[in-house]
């Protein structure tokens, strides 16, 4: 199955992982301008005294930076960017954050810790795609049933909300029924590992630590 449109714009089949605290607009722009998806957690854009709309400031900087580059390089466009949302009920910022991301037409939405159809619907209203973090086959099926477009298989060795399953087992189980966009996360740091992820059945690789 062909990749969804935003993911077809990559020069290298990699997504820069949304690194808590670390990922920021400068890193995202550097990643996108070099042909991979740059991403950041929405919660990294922390509201400061006198500046309550930091997420909007970040999205403005990223969007304008990519637009400026693309205007100068129409034959060599930048890769798209993604914003990671913690969709668990404990995230009191979620509703405000998704409204801001919709306003700025974020092209790729990465969701974690819960499958929320209402978040997927907002993303789709602005022609965005949703990739959902999963640690096993049960949650993978649940995410697709609730409207996610693709999956991030978080296997053993991944950072953040890490899984425990072997990437061989996890990718194989998901590919038995799912033909859509599938990403693999977990101890991937070089081209050989990216190629191995694709050989297993993943479309794209998630890389985080290499960008620290």
Residue ranges with predicted function:
Residues 166-212:
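Catalytic alpha/beta core domains of metabolic enzymes, predominantly
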Residues 1-181:
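Active-site entrance/lid segments in N-terminal catalytic domains of soluble metabolic enzymes
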